[in-house]
Structures are given as structure tokens and as C-alpha cells.
Amino acid sequence: MTLIDNAAGLGLRRGLLPQLLAMAPGAVDFLECAPDNWIGVGGAFGADLERLVERIPLTCHGLSLSLGGSTPLDAAFIEQTRRFLVRHRVALYSEHLSYCSDDGHLYDLLPLPFTEAAVRHVAARIREAQERLERRIAVENISYYAAPYREMSEIEFVNAVLDEADCDLLLDVNNLFVNACNHGYDALDFLVRLPPGRVAAYHVAGHYDEAPDLKIDTHGAAVKPGVWALLGAAYRRFGVRPTLLERDFNYPPLGELLLEVEQIRQWQRDEGRRHG
């Protein structure tokens, strides 16, 4: 199912299911789920998912492919994911530019070293994943608090991966804001140095201000003004693309989340008027 560029969406979380099912038509343009959490789910939860995707387009954001991992990609899981995407007519599938497994699952999204070897390694695995999934995917810039090893900057690493893997970017604006603060670089310079043709979609979310120079990516609060402003800058640089509000816990009433979705739409309209 195709998404329009000015689509504004909300993350599908089980804690929000009753409210999402009762939501008025048109309140959101799409929902996003982690297929890892829904593959093989039946019963009431599975029925609820089917009811939602019958009327609202679905995108998917994976959690456990471990694109940067050292063990072989899980071919059986990738095939399960491929079938899930086909069944639910998913237009956009993304994964994290990270690793989350070694001898077992690590239950976290860990940063890769910013090295040429890591670029070659993760790019080859992205190409393999795309071939097995029979589709182009987007990778997301993750938030991180310490880099294992650096031969290059974060932006150089991201660009090298996008080029060698020939994949798209899901630009997480909150992660960019958090990383720029925590690691002392200019978020606007990061945007300028990204190739415009690679950005497929955006995420926005809330974070926690631990200290003036330390932000924690939580997805548990409202989007902060600086992140909204950075989203506007991204729209000016790359154009409006499907944009999702992520909220993973500490859920307010759905009406409050829909007000944030409406803020996405307002930023999109503002950018449209700028070109009108």
C-alpha cells in the first residue's frame, strides 16, 4: 500500500490498541509496528491488528535483524518478516543501523564502530536482507551514548553505509537531536551532508533531559521544541516525507498523541506553503 509523502502516523503499541480501534477515521494516515512483536500472534491481539490494517495503512520498523551483528542473518526470521510485510501490504520497512545479537539476543540496539570494516560488513548484510526480503529497505540512525571505535564521523559512516548498501534512510530526528547534543556536533551540518535522495521517512519522539549536555532517548514524553524545529529543517532540506510519532510508554490519552500527529501535519503544511 503506497503512502503519500505528507502522511502523518503513530506507532502501533499494544498499550494503545483499545484507543486506536476506537479512533475516528482519518485521525492518522498510517500506523507503524515492529513485525518482530506481531509475527505469529493470534487470538484477540492478532484480530485487533487485522481490524486496524484493514482500514489504516501499515509501515514496519524492525527490532531484531541485527544488521551489524557478527552471526549470520536469521534467514528463517527474514522469511517470516517478508511474509508479514506482503500479507499486510506494507509500503515501507525499516531497521536500525545497529546490532542486537551475538551468541544470543542482547535486547538492546547497540552502536557499530565507525570504521571502513564495519561499513563493508553491515552494507553486505543490508544487501543480503534486501535480497531475501525482495524489497528495498531503510535503515535508521540510532541514538548512542558511546561509540566503540571511530575512524570517521557518524555522518561519514552513515553516508558510506547508504552508498555501499544502496538502501534508504529512515531519519530519526529525535535521535539526531540527542546525538548532536551528547556528542557535540551540529545537527544542521549533519542534515546538509546527507544525500537528499536517500531519505524515505522520518521519526519524531520525546527524550529526557538528564543534563544540559546529556539527553536520553526515551520515547516516553512529548516531542520537544528543538526536535520540532529540526524536523522543519529536515523538511526544508529533503522535502516532506511520511513522518511518524513514536511513543513507547507513559501513554497519555490518545487525544494528546493525536495533537502531536496534528503538529506533524502542521509542519508539513507549512513546508507545502513555502513551496506554494
Curated annotation (Swiss-Prot):
Gene3D superfamilies: Divalent-metal-dependent TIM barrel enzymes (3.20.20.150). It holds the Pfam family MbnB_TglH_ChrH. It comes from Pseudomonas aeruginosa (strain ATCC 15692 / DSM 22644 / CIP 104116 / JCM 14847 / LMG 12228 / 1C / PRS 101 / PAO1). InterPro entries: MbnB/TglH/ChrH (IPR007801), Xyl_isomerase-like_sf (IPR036237). Belongs to the UPF0276 family. This is UPF0276 protein PA4106.
